[in-house]
Amino acid sequence: MLYWLTQLLQGQYHAFRVFQYLTFRSILASLTALIVGLLCGPLMIRWLRGLQIGQMVRSDGPQTHLSKAGTPTMGGVLILLAITVSCLLWCDLRQTSLWLVLLVTLANGLVGWVDDYRKLVLKNSKGLPGRWKYFWQSVIALVAVSYLYWNASLPVHTQLTVPFFKTVTWDLGVFFPVLAYFVIVGSSNAVNLTDGLDGLAIMPIVMVAGALGVFAYASSNAVYSNYLGIPYVPNTGELTIFCSSIVGAGLGFLWYNSYPAQVFMGDVGSLALGAALGIVAIVVRQELVLLIMGGLFVIETLSVILQVGYFKYSGGKRLFRMAPLHHHFELKGWSEPKVIVRFWIITVVFVLCGLATLKLR
């Protein structure tokens, strides 16, 4: 909205031409989302406390988590509010890729909200049954990937780019929707599994989103993409602003979610933000780079898969003390802040490796 207003004023006031630049609007978007998060955070926390929407803690988990019982959750609503407000203010709303990404994010947030509402308000311990959660995630993903597939007007739209190789691409053709579906649903659930400690998930989300914003910016520019040897994907520049909004909103949320957390994001936040990372990676054609940068989410998910599989086929034995992996280290005696910071450090390494693919080809 403000971007549209600045467009009208450019003819009379040359200073407003600065709003044409993605970099400038990205900074403003990030700051806007940060301010919305910081200002609305206390109001959201008080409101959730008033509704008695508090976290339920597993009795079989680390005993240190028992003190978290009753901590307000569903704070992901605050993150989504900050992202949406920021995008509406600073994005060029004529770009369809922005609306696709934003709608996929909010739709997955709605699925998470229903799950949280059933668990925390209706006191249904199972929340939204797994099969229904997966069903609605699948519907959202299939609608999104079908739109992308049927509107693919350039070869790059269905090509898989292999990191570290300048000329290695695979034309997925009819298999593009399959890959895209698993990226969206998989990313959404992987982030959800990681969100188990104070601030553990949100900081990696911020780092990966920021890096994806760099890819979105470079991919939308023919000169930069040619120089870096990455796919040129027209009309995706506004996703830089979307990613910047995630960065700002995430940092604003971390202010209240850092240890000891005053609020948790809940499924409404984790499912939405995971899906956001997935759909952005698909649109800018960097699915494999997301796999690298989101390595922490991959490791956490694999720990659950391995734990369940090993338990099933070994007759009840466990590979880890507890899954996801962050709980394993807690039960080994690591303090919660130590687990969190070390997992953040791991994410920094993964994100740097992903960014290295911009030049190492």
UniProtKB/Swiss-Prot annotation:
InterPro entries: Glycosyl_transferase_4, PNAcMuramoyl-5peptid_Trfase, PNAcMuramoyl-5peptid_Trfase_CS. GO terms for biological process: cell division; cell wall organization; peptidoglycan biosynthetic process; regulation of cell shape. It is a multi-pass membrane protein. The chain crosses the membrane at residues 27-47, 70-90, 97-117, 134-154, 167-187, 199-219, 236-256, 263-283, 288-308, 338-358. Pathway: Cell wall biogenesis; peptidoglycan biosynthesis. Its EC number is 2.7.8.13. GO terms for molecular function: metal ion binding; phospho-N-acetylmuramoyl-pentapeptide-transferase activity; UDP-N-acetylmuramoyl-L-alanyl-D-glutamyl-meso-2,6-diaminopimelyl-D-alanyl-D-alanine:undecaprenyl-phosphate transferase activity. Its main location: membrane. Keywords: Cell cycle, Cell division, Cell inner membrane, Cell membrane, Cell shape, Cell wall biogenesis/degradation, Magnesium, Membrane, Metal-binding, Peptidoglycan synthesis, Transferase, Transmembrane, Transmembrane helix. CDD domains: GT_MraY. GO terms for cellular component: plasma membrane. Its cofactor is Mg(2+). Pfam families: Glycos_transf_4 (PF00953), MraY_sig1 (PF10555). It is found in: Cell inner membrane. Belongs to the glycosyltransferase 4 family. MraY subfamily. Catalyzes the initial step of the lipid cycle reactions in the biosynthesis of the cell wall peptidoglycan: transfers peptidoglycan precursor phospho-MurNAc-pentapeptide from UDP-MurNAc-pentapeptide onto the lipid carrier undecaprenyl phosphate, yielding undecaprenyl-pyrophosphoryl-MurNAc-pentapeptide, known as lipid I. HAMAP family: MraY. This is Phospho-N-acetylmuramoyl-pentapeptide-transferase. It comes from Legionella pneumophila (strain Corby). The gene is mraY.
